[in-house]
């Protein structure tokens, strides 16, 4: 039986208590190691970076990573403002044993570190986690082949690369592979799980639902025209993917028949105030069209980007909308609830002895969650090609300078 949509009034004290209890039930079992690999896109031939988190016995230390997965080489006090800090054992050996593999696919304009807190939670509970920065994804390129065909194939190539890795490959249980996808990453997960995408469905969606205007106007006119010209999208299903989690997913490229073909367990999250992928046309529709057993939660007051981990302080000036939530919504509190939920979902659905991969025999605990929005990485076209850390420092400098001028010289 499908778990019905849940409408929640934000994160109340009771919900917070439930989240603490739930997190306690899923206490970490391992320290977390990190390293980076590069994988070749089978469509464009480009190399793209993939962040790997995995269980280890090695002692962690503070690691400051930039958006490009490089180490921040500035003083720690500066790195904390402009880079992503995690407690990790860099390049350490994995622990003994067998692990599941989870690939996390970000939304358009996103990065491999968008869902780093979820990656840490999964890795500390015995999963290898791989999160790419999809080729051209950080540039909000949603044109034809690079997204509709490229993204799912990139995830399949990541699975290949991890299984072939001499250190991690022998530890992966091949029947315990899942995908988490946010926004266009949700499209990616659905396509890998057996829902055949169609550009005709996408075009029809935008013709029929003119009120989904922001989604249908997303990207450049050239990118939208490239999508119209792509023609039939091939079936990119990967039978190795045994369960998926969707967060504020893009459902427009799928008709109901395609969604009915998904034959793996699904847990989906919608955001009530998602103004990029309107919930009634995307997450709510998925909940009705996916096969029985789908677990669905609609989060009250959440926005499209509420699923993305919080950004370092100075980077919030750069990423803009992706760092903001609807008024009154607590992103960090929501993540304290959703991360253990997702760990629990994969624990239940990717059990090594689980013969049936469709739906869930037992409904997941109904705790709240959130969602996400996608926009340009910056507003200044001359700066959009620069490293996020440089843009953040410039933005921080400008903000402080204006504040000093206003305070000292009464300049507006």
Predicted features along the sequence, with ranges:
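Alpha/beta-hydrolase active-site loop
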Residues: 145-170, 207-213
């Amino acid at each position: 039986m499908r778990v019905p949509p849940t409408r929640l009034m934000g994160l109340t004290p009771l919900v917070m208590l439930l989240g603490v209890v739930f997190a306690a039930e899923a206490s970490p079992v391992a320290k977390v190691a990190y390293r980076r690999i590069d994988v070749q896109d089978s469509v464009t031939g480009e190399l793209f970076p993939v962040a790997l988190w995995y269980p280890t016995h090695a002692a962690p230390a503070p690691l400051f990573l930039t958006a490009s997965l490089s180490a921040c080489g500035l003083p720690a006090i500066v790195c904390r403002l402009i880079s992503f800090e995690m407690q990790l054992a860099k390049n350490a050996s994995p622990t003994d044993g067998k692990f599941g593999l989870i690939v996390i696919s970000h939304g358009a304009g996103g990065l491999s570190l968008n869902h780093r807190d979820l990656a840490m939670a999964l890795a500390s509970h015995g999963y290898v986690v791989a999160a790419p920065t999809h080729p051209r994804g950080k540039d909000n390129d949603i044109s034809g082949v690079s997204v509709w065909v490229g993204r799912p194939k990139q995830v399949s190539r990541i699975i290949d690369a991890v299984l072939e890795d001499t250190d991690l490959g022998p530890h992966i249980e091949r029947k315990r592979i899942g995908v988490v996808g946010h926004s266009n990453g949700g499209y990616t997960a659905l396509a890998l799980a057996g829902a055949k995408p169609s550009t005709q469905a996408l075009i029809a969606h935008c013709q029929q639902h003119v009120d989904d205007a922001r989604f249908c106007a997303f990207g450049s006119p050239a990118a939208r025209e490239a999508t119209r010209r792509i023609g039939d999208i091939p079936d990119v299903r990967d039978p190795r993917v045994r369960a998926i989690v969707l967060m504020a997913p893009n459902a427009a490229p799928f008709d109901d028949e395609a969604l009915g073909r998904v034959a793996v367990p699904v847990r989906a999250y919608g955001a009530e105030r998602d103004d990029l992928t309107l919930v009634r046309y995307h997450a709510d529709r998925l909940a009705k069209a996916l096969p029985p057993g789908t677990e669905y939660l609609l989060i009250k007051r959440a926005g499209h980007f509420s699923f993305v981990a919080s950004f370092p302080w100075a980077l919030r000036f750069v990423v803009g909308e992706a760092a903001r939530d609807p008024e009154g919504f607590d992103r960090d509190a929501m993540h304290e609830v959703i991360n253990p939920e997702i760990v629990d979902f994969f624990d239940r659905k990717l059990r090594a002895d689980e013969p049936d991969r469709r739906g869930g025999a037992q409904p997941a605990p109904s705790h709240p969650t959130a969602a996400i929005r996608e926009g340009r990485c910056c507003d200044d076209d001359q700066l959009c090609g620069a490293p996020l850390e440089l843009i953040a420092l410039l933005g921080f400098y400008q903000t402080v300078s204006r504040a000093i001028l206003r305070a000292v010289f009464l300049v507006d």
